Amino acid sequence: MKKDTSELKIHYKSLKKEIKQRLRQFSALPAPDYFYELCFCLLTPQSNAKKCWQAVEKLKKCRLEGRKINSRRIKSCLRQNTRFYRKKAKYIKEAVKKWHLIKEKITKIKDAAELRNWLADKDNVKGLGYKEASHFLRNIGKSQNKAAILDRHILRNLKRYGVVREIPNLNKKNYLLIEKKMIDFSIKLGIPLDELDLLLWAKETGNVFK
């Protein structure tokens, strides 16, 4: 069933300038900061995004790149700010080890869908699924309006607006199917996918963040 989207369009009009500014900030992110955006996206599952960013700020002070990896130090940065910090510390440790390869792929693979597929492969980056890989690409300005971040805020709104009937388990097949529906929805609204994601997130949380 189609739902009225007039209120959403009004909300977009009020936030459009801020949303576009945030996306410009993502696109202008210096390459050395990509690593910490990856850390952020590894931390966010089942955790508060702003608290996760506080943990990332602590990680930045540790300057993990190029250093001997100190698991205890990583855990201490995460403990107060994210759930399942022990497991996520392991993911970050692995990301440090593989960062040279990850950087190379970000540079070489120009298509967002292809790059996300590589990032979401657990043999390449542990702890990243399709949602987290999409989030990472958006936050470094490389999602090309092709990668939906299907978190609980977005999924609730897609159901609310009749884009999906129910919220299924997000295996790869279902993720790509719902993503296609969200892209079609964004086209009908006249709102680019990356902007729609930030709009729906702001609608749920009250602010345009990451």
Which residues fall in each region the model found?
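Alpha-helical ds-nucleic-acid-binding substructure associated with the helix-hairpin-helix region
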Residues: 56-126
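Conserved aromatic-histidine-acidic binding/catalytic patches
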Residues: 31, 40, 44-47, 80, ...
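Non-catalytic, well-ordered alpha-helical scaffold segments
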Residues: 33-41, 53, 86-93, 131-134, ...
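C-terminal accessory module of base-excision DNA glycosylases/AP lyases that mediates lesion recognition
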Residues: 1-28, 89, 106-117, 124-210
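Short, hydrophobic/amphipathic alpha-helical patches that form generic packing surfaces
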Residues: 37-46, 93-97, 138, 197-203
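Structure-specific DNA junction-binding interface
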Residues: 1-62, 68-76, 80-82, 209
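Short helix-capping and hinge/turn segments at secondary-structure transitions, especially at repeat
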Residues: 48, 64, 97-104, 138-142, ...
